[in-house]
Curated annotation (Swiss-Prot):
Cofactor(s) the protein requires to work: a divalent metal cation
Catalysed reaction, written as an equation: a ribonucleoside 5'-triphosphate + H2O = a ribonucleoside 5'-phosphate + diphosphate + H(+); a 2'-deoxyribonucleoside 5'-triphosphate + H2O = a 2'-deoxyribonucleoside 5'-phosphate + diphosphate + H(+)
NCBIfam families reported for this sequence: maf (TIGR00172)
Membership in a protein family: Belongs to the Maf family.
Protein function: Nucleoside triphosphate pyrophosphatase. May have a dual role in cell division arrest and in preventing the incorporation of modified nucleotides into cellular nucleic acids.
Entry protein name: Nucleoside triphosphate pyrophosphatase
Taxonomic lineage from the root: Bacteria, Bacillati, Actinomycetota, Actinomycetes, Mycobacteriales
Active-site residues, record numbering mapped to chain: 82
Listed GO CC annotations: cytoplasm
Pfam families, per database record: Maf
Primary localization class, coarse: cytoplasm
Localization annotation: Cytoplasm
EC number: 3.6.1.9
Amino acid sequence: MTRLVLGSASSGRLKVLQQAGVDPLVVVSGVDEDAIMAGLGPAATPADVVRVLARAKAEQVATTLTGQQASVATDCLVIGCDSMLYIDGRLCGKPETVDDARQLWRSMAGRCGHLYTGHSVVRLTEQRVTHRDDETSTTTVHFATPSDDDLEAYLATGESLKVAGGFTLDGLGGWFITGVEGDPSAVVGIGLPLTRDLISRAGISIAALWASNPLP
């Protein structure tokens, strides 16, 4: 029985997994993303950045679990993810202010950007790491051009400050997405096809995850 552990506070990622029939334990990593990115240097590619961040989150949660006196389960699979939008030669995470989100949306309007999502898994067996793996998915997102009134109304909801790139596909921001090339679930924050591959390489089937992590 493998317990799935999601190393993320993202409600979007949790929702994707639950809609796919799995109810994971949520353990937030709390890693210092800015410090990790600063340590990567300018040569790091967008795919490298999100993969390293995802790995750091999964590793931090795995360390937390191995340090507990009472283990969550004999067998655990920790998943860490990180998403960032690449547009105009720069990586964009969560906007820090409404003004930042407004400028980002004005630069995205009527154009497309590339959403990079890093995925990392760490398997723990009897509190020992027995498997590590990570990979990045890339999805192209096409944006509409919202009117000034619509954009201001969207910014006023606060949703844009909670997500990478300042937009959602599965929320209010979905009104302003005209198309997606690639995996839609990766845009929400965790790509099911890539996650399935990583889980399989860890020696675990989706059927086994359904059985050991049932929805309430």
